Amino acid sequence: MAIQAEEISALIKQQLEKFDTTLTVEEVGTVTYIGDGVARATGLANAMAGELLEFANGTFGMAQNLESSEVGIIILGGFDDIREGDTVKRTGRIMEVPVGEQLIGRVVNALGQPIDGLGEIKTDKFRPVEVKAPGVMQRKSVFEPLQTGIKAIDALVPIGRGQRELIIGDRKTGKTSLAIDTILNQKDQNMIVIYVAIGQKDSTVRTQVETLRQMGAMDYTIVVNAGPSEPAPMLYLAPYVGAAMGEEFMYNGKHVLIVYDDLSKQATAYRELSLILRRPPGREAYPGDVFYLHSRLLERAAKLSDELGGGSMTALPIIETQAGDVSAYIPTNVISITDGQVFLDADQFYAGVRPAIDAGTSVSRVGGDAQIKAMKKVAGTLRLDLASFRELESFAQFGSDLDAATQAKLARGRRTVEVLKQPLHKPMPVQHQVIVLYALTHGYIDDIAVEDIQRFQDELIAYVDANANDLFKVIIDTKQLPEESAMNAAIEAFKAGFAGSAAE
């Protein structure tokens, strides 16, 4: 076959035209140490703090330590394929995660990748994991309520949209249950929820996700999971990833609730990384910037000003204490960062008072402004009554000859404790709470036997719903307490029937 000279020259010309003369400059380093989710590399003199670096096998890492001759890198993912002597190059980018509506209803890992087996997440929106929190002038004071559906919280330690409220207590005192119930109550509240599970057992997270799915809560929830078997960098990053996902909605004028379950495990993971990176240890072997670890995360929760769309992100961080010691390092740090705390008491929990909220040590610093007027009126003296009851109760153990006024206070206190008990995964709408607490504070429950109180409140709600539904409508529409005469009449009418049924 004869080869035409013209064809050859045409092919050569074509190749020459395609030839790219531009040079691509890459800064490449060499891995000198690898292990425990951390790598060290030399030759990356211009690497920036927090920059994404790419290893030879395609795994990414993040520059954490910038030293004179080496860079300390936390590895984002598995590190089994990385060896000493491998190359690692700069990308010039910082870490970003996928965000947007497409993530709602999904379970993702700390890199935003789906782990629920429901296929890939198609989104073209990404946000950086580390972002500066909104400044003072970009914020607005908290004024809208976040209804948790838990009587003890909505009445005693109300939470507002844009607030940071810490849930703190020993292990197995119902911290996660409190958060899950709050998520369930957001069903018709126009909220998007992000649940960040940090170092929780995979079986536990699976159970929580199934609960949310059965109750229809996955329709507005994103779950970010960093399990205990994953490398420490994933546990460290997971909360920031959740915050980035929440900010996408917040800056678009929506309302977000984010639960960090729990930040004690994030602090432990960060301590592990810092020690491997040879950072100087401080109190309890945590690094010096462990306060900044949590403050820069929790400051990202805010109520934005009207100019920025008026969106909000409410944070419910969870901290686990050891034997009720809230004066340990991490608990005191997070208490000082947040706008109040819900303290769960192990003794009350084991005594059957659930949720085991300690009214004396729980506080909400800004939520009072967000409480609806009706709730403010009926719950005004509840906290003081409960605190004085606890005081009297311990005093009453030493003597039985108490005067009538003290006996009455103790009786009211026992009924208050009973009213504030609530079954698991049964959040109560605010209008129902108002009616029940009104009946309590106005003495209608004083002569009901303690063991009948749960039945009394359930039947009272059903009665008002069927016979005086306008009371609920007034509370929902105006946020005000209905006419006292109408409420008294409804409760008295119900009580007449209830007393009869109890006497049978």
Swiss-Prot record:
Major location (coarse): membrane
Cellular component terms per the entry's GO annotation: plasma membrane; proton-transporting ATP synthase complex
Pfam families in UniProt: ATP-synt_ab, ATP-synt_ab_C, ATP-synt_ab_N
EC number of the protein: 7.1.2.2
Gene transcribed to yield this protein: atpA
HAMAP family xrefs: ATP_synth_alpha_bact (MF_01346)
PROSITE patterns the UniProt entry points to: ATPASE_ALPHA_BETA (PS00152)
Binding-site residues, ATP: 169-176
Name assigned to this protein: ATP synthase subunit alpha
EC category name: translocase
Family annotation (SUPFAM superfamilies): C-terminal domain of alpha and beta subunits of F1 ATP synthase, N-terminal domain of alpha and beta subunits of F1 ATP synthase, P-loop containing nucleoside triphosphate hydrolases
Family assignment from sequence similarity: Belongs to the ATPase alpha/beta chains family.
Residues flagged as site, Required for activity: 362
Keywords (A to Z) from UniProt: ATP synthesis, ATP-binding, Cell membrane, CF(1), Hydrogen ion transport, Ion transport, Membrane, Nucleotide-binding, Translocase, Transport
Reactions catalysed, as given in the entry: ATP + H2O + 4 H(+)(in) = ADP + phosphate + 5 H(+)(out)
Membrane topology, from the record: Peripheral membrane protein
